[in-house]
Curated annotation (Swiss-Prot):
The gene is atpH. It comes from Myxococcus xanthus (strain DK1622). This is ATP synthase subunit delta. GO terms for cellular component: plasma membrane; proton-transporting ATP synthase complex. It is a peripheral membrane protein. Keywords: ATP synthesis, Cell inner membrane, Cell membrane, CF(1), Hydrogen ion transport, Ion transport, Membrane, Transport.
Length: 182
């Protein structure tokens, strides 16, 4: 298992530098994109974490991936990625990206939420749901949507550790439990 405290140190340092430059959101987006590219390609992951490859080979791969990201990457992120190559810490990249995003959200007063519905939600319904969740949590809520036909209907929203479940599937399960108890 990856030592999260190491990833946290790199994420915090990158956040501090990105915040000073006023580029936190851009760095977060680019770091997530970079980590996603690496995570989705097993060969890239192997090159970046396998000790059989030299630092120079890893650095060339990292530089190539940075160039492949649309719009390039911020200088602070590029320097951090080069440092990770130099220190053989690229195995922590996914955790660094996740922790960076979480810390940036916390610093900005945001919280991420996941909305699951049986069918795609219209934009106005999603906006209304987001506004309701913001009122409940007293924070700016960023929603990610997902479709799960097994819900049958309704919506399930998780914000932080709190689950708001208004799905028909859950309501049917509750009715089944109540009927069994009688």
């Amino acid at each position: 298992m990856v030592n999260v405290s190491i990833a946290r140190r790199y994420a915090r340092a990158l956040l501090d530098v990105a915040s000073e430059a006023g580029r936190t959101d851009a760095v977060a987006e680019q770091l997530t994109a970079f980590a996603d590219v690496i995570a989705k390609n097993a060969e890239l992951t192997d090159v970046l974490v396998n000790p059989a490859y030299t630092r120079e080979q890893r650095l060339r791969v990292v530089e190539s991936v940075m160039q492949a990201i649309p719009g390039g990457v911020e200088a602070t992120l590029a320097n951090t990625l080069r440092l990770l190559v130099d220190r053989n810490r690229l195995g922590y990249l996914a955790d660094i990206a996740r922790l960076f995003r979480d810390m940036a959200d916390a610093r900005a007063g945001r919280v991420r939420g996941h909305v699951t519905s049986a069918a795609p939600l219209p934009a106005d319904a999603l906006a209304q749901l987001q506004q309701t969740l913001q009122q409940l949590t007293q924070r700016n809520v960023l929603l990610e949507t997902r479709v799960d036909p097994s819900l049958l209907g309704g919506v399930s929203a998780q914000v932080g550790s709190i689950l708001y479940d208004g799905s028909i599937r859950t309501q049917l399960e509750e009715m089944r439990r109540e009927l069994k108890q009688r």
